[in-house]
């Protein structure tokens, strides 16, 4: 496998997992709407899988945790665009900002005993086993992103002052007619429809 030393659990204001990693207490809560809507989960399903496979100490060895609010998301989109010329969507911007902060001094500050105010966005107070590699500039971060910034045009425009380009494939999809099939919220009706139409 790939020589991966660890991960950054970066999210938005729905920071249930970063809070758990930092405090050891898992507190599911109602989700809060943010610019990074795919992360708007107050009770993440992956928690149960992680808890079944690893102890909290094992998770803390492998994961740094980080969160941003909407203002931070806009700043991250803007900062990435200014520093690199790349336009990110809100979800990728959270990951980018997390890694940028971690490698630019947040991990060193944490290792030196300077703790971020836990109620403010940023790196939470947990030092993973790979923290020293970051401080020594011996770590490389890899960001994986799947969403196009064009799907979040208004948010991206607010951040960088211009609309993101729309990829040709997305333009093709946007030209397709809308197709919706009104249906009651009933599993059996849905199942019957699927069986009849597939």
Q: How does the language model describe each region?
A:
Residues 1-198:
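PLP-dependent amino-acid enzyme catalytic core
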């Amino acid at each position: 496998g790939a020589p991966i030393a660890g991960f950054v659990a970066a999210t938005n204001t729905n920071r249930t997992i970063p809070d758990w990693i930092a405090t050891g207490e898992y507190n599911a809560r109602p989700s809060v709407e943010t610019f990074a809507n795919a992360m708007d989960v107050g009770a993440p399903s992956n928690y149960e899988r992680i808890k079944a496979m690893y102890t909290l100490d094992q998770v803390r060895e492998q994961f740094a945790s980080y969160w941003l609010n909407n203002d931070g998301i806009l700043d991250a989109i803007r900062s990435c665009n200014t520093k690199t010329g790349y336009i990110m969507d809100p979800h990728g911007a959270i990951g980018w900002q997390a890694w940028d902060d971690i490698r630019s001094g947040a991990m060193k500050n944490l290792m030196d005993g300077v703790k971020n105010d836990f109620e403010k966005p940023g790196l939470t107070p947990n030092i993973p086993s790979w923290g020293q590699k970051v401080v020594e500039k011996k770590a490389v971060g890899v960001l994986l992103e799947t969403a196009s910034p064009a799907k979040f045009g208004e948010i991206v425009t607010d951040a960088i002052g211009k609309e993101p380009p729309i990829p040709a494939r997305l333009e093709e999809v946007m030209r397709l007619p809308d197709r919706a099939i009104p249906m009651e919220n009933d599993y059996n009706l849905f199942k019957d429809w699927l069986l009849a139409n597939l």
